[in-house]
Amino acid sequence: MASATRLIQRLRNWASGHDLQAKLQLRYQEISKRTQPPPKLPVGPSHKLSNNYYCTRDGRRESVPPSIIMSSQKALVSGKPAESSAVAATEKKAVTPAPPIKRWELSSDQPYL
């Protein structure tokens, strides 16, 4: 439309009801300005504007398991047996899903197998 003659421009403007040539310079009105004000973020784990990586913005990383302040049950100290247990502590073997594997013996007639 910018290369149309004056007669065609006026005909188009009259048919559309408004000036189409005035709009050509400002056709991108929804473009944001180059200088933006800094965002107003609420105070929290991601309120910093720089040095704000994704892994540190995740609020789940700041949660910790609950700390036990007081318990009605007596906790055992690790490495010491309970005082009330009358059974002697025996050394326990590791639990395996099958019986132990038998060691194969090499045949004496063919020593290289």
Swiss-Prot record:
Main location class: mitochondrion
Record keywords: Acetylation, Electron transport, Membrane, Mitochondrion, Mitochondrion inner membrane, Phosphoprotein, Respiratory chain, Transport
Region of interest (Disordered), residue spans: 31-51, 86-113
GO cellular component: mitochondrial inner membrane; respiratory chain complex I
Membrane topology (UniProt): Peripheral membrane protein
InterPro entries attached to this UniProt entry: NDUA7
Oligomer and partners: Complex I is composed of 45 different subunits.
Job of this protein: Accessory subunit of the mitochondrial membrane respiratory chain NADH dehydrogenase (Complex I), that is believed not to be involved in catalysis. Complex I functions in the transfer of electrons from NADH to the respiratory chain. The immediate electron acceptor for the enzyme is believed to be ubiquinone.
Protein name per the record: NADH dehydrogenase [ubiquinone] 1 alpha subcomplex subunit 7
Annotated gene: NDUFA7
